[in-house]
Swiss-Prot record:
Residues 165-352 are annotated as: Imidazoleglycerol-phosphate dehydratase. The lineage of its organism: Bacteria, Pseudomonadati, Campylobacterota, Epsilonproteobacteria, Campylobacterales. The active site is at 9 (nucleophile), 11 (proton donor). Keywords: Amino-acid biosynthesis, Cytoplasm, Histidine biosynthesis, Hydrolase, Lyase, Magnesium, Metal-binding, Multifunctional enzyme, Zinc. The gene is hisB. This is Histidine biosynthesis bifunctional protein HisB. It holds the Pfam family IGPD. One of its GO terms (molecular function) is imidazoleglycerol-phosphate dehydratase activity.
Length: 352
């Protein structure tokens, strides 16, 4: 099974590389690069596995005794393990460049098993390193390379997560032209549907759901808002479903109960068996330019496009607050349900 793998260089990327002799052969020389450990911990929580790939010139020769290397190397691994970080595999080439060996980066001989058996997902794997050879290795593996030094570890984290659990979706009909972009790990928020109150409600999903959300909609508002609201729901639902991918590791279930002067609740299950239970009554026919009857239709269309079972309920006096409560409750339940909390699929059937 293909995995999301980070192929990580060691010296100059994970730990500092001494400029004097380019060897970490004593404990005194062992220093971690800034933010390397917290970044790897966060990426681990998103299901990434780690593989170390390092060139160690002349390892095992009199100029670089293996026992000196291992003292610092084993200490580094012990520290990482104590923080919850372990490498699935460690590959080290001990040769000098002029030996023209088959294993030295950017050649791929050390990773032959990964290539032969397709053990890494090319779309969701990366090479992280500080040298041009690391970037060439990335190209040889068919994955994206992220160059440390040009990017900090925090910037590397953002680059990886922005490309992971993200999706774009476009829906074009004779009635509407809609573009949606979702990043479940957070990001830019920009919503323009031509219906101001609807924009305000969709913004609640982004802000309280902790997701990046960009929506642009050009619809036949000269007729009414029905097609725009319905098609935005369908496009948004399809985009969220696409961003979730195989759903491995997600919590799957979400429940929220925001309470102001009104009480709103939402229960959600990414079961791929769409269903909506909706209990809400409004005094007004419209909130701004949005018909209150379209709120139920929005969530109906959204639940079917997402493939979720959705239960929504609200009680209160103020119609604006009730509508906002429904969208906030949905957002909080969504945030809970899409959170990565394990390495497994949350289903005894093995599929959702």
């Amino acid at each position: 099974m293909s995995q999301k793998i980070l192929f990580i260089d060691r010296d100059g990327t994970l730990i500092e590389e001494p400029k004097s002799d380019f060897q970490i052969d004593t404990l005194e020389k062992l220093r971690f690069e800034k933010d390397a450990i917290p970044t790897l911990l966060k990426l681990k929580n998103f299901g990434f596995k780690f593989v170390m790939v390092s060139n160690q010139d002349g390892l095992g020769t009199p100029s670089f005794p293996k026992e000196n290397f291992e003292i610092a190397h084993e200490k580094m691994l012990d520290i990482l393990k104590s923080c919850g970080i372990e490498f699935q595999d460690i590959f080290i080439c001990p040769h000098f460049e002029n030996e023209n060996c088959a294993c030295r980066k950017p050649k791929t001989a050390m990773l032959e098993e990964y290539i032969k058996h397709e053990l890494y997902d090319k779309e969701q794997s990366f090479v992280i390193g500080d040298r041009e050879s690391d970037m060439i290795l990335a190209s040889n593996l068919g994955v994206r390379g992220l160059r440390y030094g040009e990017l900090s570890w925090k910037e590397i984290e953002n680059e990886i997560l922005s490309s992971f659990r993200s999706a774009s979706y476009q829906r074009t009909t004779k009635e509407t032209d809609i573009k949606v972009k979702v990043c479940l790990n957070g990001g830019k928020i920009s919503i323009k549907t031509g219906i101001d109150f609807f924009d305000h409600m969709l913004e609640q999903i982004a802000v309280h759901g902790g997701i990046g959300l960009e929506i642009s909609c050009k619809g036949d508002l000269e007729i009414d808002e029905h097609h725009s609201v319905e098609d935005v729901a369908l496009a948004l639902g399809a985009c969220i479903k696409k961003a979730l991918g195989d759903k491995i590791g997600i919590a799957r279930y979400g429940f929220a109960l925001p309470m102001d002067e009104c009480l709103a609740s939402c229960a959600m299950d990414f079961c791929n068996r769409p269903h909506l239970v909706y209990k809400a009554k409004f005094k007004k026919s419209h909130l701004g330019a949005l018909s209150t009857e379209m709120i139920e239709h929005f969530f109906y269309s959204l639940s079917y496009a997402m493939g979720v079972s959705l239960h929504l309920k609200v009680k209160g006096k103020n119609d604006h607050h009730k509508a906002e409560g429904l969208f906030k409750a949905f957002a909080k339940a969504l945030k809970m349900a899409v959170k990565i909390e394990s390495e497994n699929l949350a289903s005894s059937k093995g599929v959702i």
